[in-house]
Amino acid sequence: MTAVRAVVFDIGGVIQDSPLHAIARYEADHGLPAGVINRAVVAAGEAGAWSRLERGELTVEAWCAPFERDCRAHGITVDARRLMEYIAAAGRERPVMLRAVDRLRERGLRVGALTNNWATEAAPTGPHPIARHFDALVESRAVGMRKPDPRIYRLICQHLQVEPAETAFLDDIGANLKPARALGMRTIKVDDPEQALRELGAMVGFDLL
């Protein structure tokens, strides 16, 4: 088996706390069925407001009205601005993951981040504040494509100057892992950060905890 020369991390749900938890809190606080917002996003598809936001085609301000329409089409009423406030308040970094990133780089591996995101007031056009931890960062809103588009996985590998078969990829969403596996990347689904790092440590041959 080809040795792992690079590791790629998702940000939300891996390096930072998951925005899905913030969405779940919004649903609970507003009497919505669990998971219904994600189902509305999936139903709207690549032409939906959420996908367009993550591809950088909409600002957050311009996204609100079409996203609320997508939700109404799915039978729910959502205050998009309030939902985004929940998400913005939830992005705490996970120190255990950042320590692992540092250790990987110290041992000579290339380390990248691959994230579906959108422009914010804190970083409207510049790089993500967490970029300094990585050798390369690919943001969906900056490149006009989003996971699970296979092209975005190839792009991060190009930035890291490695082949997909030389790369491990960590994400908290199964649908984002499937295209990576199809390209030959080794994948880890992150439910528990420490368990994920144990799996990654076994792949790279040294402890990350």
Locate predicted features:
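Asp-based, Mg2+/Mn2+-dependent phosphohydrolase catalytic module
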Residues: 1-5, 9, 102, 114, ...
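Structured helix-beta-strand junction loops
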Residues: 107-108, 133
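N-terminal helical cap/lid subdomain that shapes the substrate entry/recognition surface
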Residues: 2-99, 106-107
